[in-house]
Amino acid sequence: GIISLILQIGNIISIWVSHSIQTGSQNHTGICNQRIITYENSTWVNQTYVNISNTNVVAGKDTTSMTLAGNSSLCPIRGWAIYSKDNSIRIGSKGDVFVIREP
């Protein structure tokens, strides 16, 4: 009981410290204001990586941050999905798309 609680608190603290070390004090708000969208796919084929990169220029698109229904802003998304142990894409009930990568 109490040991499990202490281990979980230690796990959350270590994830927070790791995230703080990786990001530092960087602010990534400029990512949402891009007019160029790059789709990149790295696939393992015959012991080598094949990189496929498609670049699209979004013309005439409004770059302001958009708020969806339910008062959830589309960008930026911050935080950790602590209980997700796999690489996955989750689609929320309001249409939000979350890409979760295993650390």
UniProtKB/Swiss-Prot annotation:
Q: Where, per UniProt, does this protein localize?
A: Virion membrane; Host apical cell membrane
Subunit comment: Homotetramer.
User: Which family is it part of?
Assistant: Belongs to the glycosyl hydrolase 34 family.
The record's section on InterPro entries has:
Sialidase_sf
Give the first-level EC class, as a single word: hydrolase
Activity control: Inhibited by the neuraminidase inhibitors zanamivir (Relenza) and oseltamivir (Tamiflu). These drugs interfere with the release of progeny virus from infected cells and are effective against all influenza strains. Resistance to neuraminidase inhibitors is quite rare.
Tell me more from the record.
The influenza A genome consist of 8 RNA segments. Genetic variation of hemagglutinin and/or neuraminidase genes results in the emergence of new influenza strains. The mechanism of variation can be the result of point mutations or the result of genetic reassortment between segments of two different strains.
Residues carrying a glycan: 27, 41, 46, 51, 71
Q: What is this protein called?
A: Neuraminidase
| Catalytic activity annotation | Hydrolysis of alpha-(2->3)-, alpha-(2->6)-, alpha-(2->8)- glycosidic linkages of terminal sialic acid residues in oligosaccharides, glycoproteins, glycolipids, colominic acid and synthetic substrates
State the post-translational modifications: N-glycosylated.
The segments annotated as topological domain Virion surface are: 19-103
TM segments?
1-18
**Alphabetically ordered keywords of this record:** Calcium, Glycoprotein, Glycosidase, Host cell membrane, Host membrane, Hydrolase, Membrane, Metal-binding, Signal-anchor, Transmembrane, Transmembrane helix, Virion
Q: Which GO terms describe its molecular function?
A: exo-alpha-sialidase activity; metal ion binding
Q: Identify the EC number(s).
A: 3.2.1.18
Q: How is the cofactor bound?
A: Binds 1 Ca(2+) ion per subunit.
Chief subcellular location equals: virion
Q: What is known of its domains?
A: Intact N-terminus is essential for virion morphogenesis. Possesses two apical sorting signals, one in the ectodomain, which is likely to be a glycan, and the other in the transmembrane domain. The transmembrane domain also plays a role in lipid raft association.
What's the superkingdom here? Viruses
Query: Briefly, what is this protein's role?
Result: Catalyzes the removal of terminal sialic acid residues from viral and cellular glycoconjugates. Cleaves off the terminal sialic acids on the glycosylated HA during virus budding to facilitate virus release. Additionally helps virus spread through the circulation by further removing sialic acids from the cell surface. These cleavages prevent self-aggregation and ensure the efficient spread of the progeny virus from cell to cell. Otherwise, infection would be limited to one round of replication.
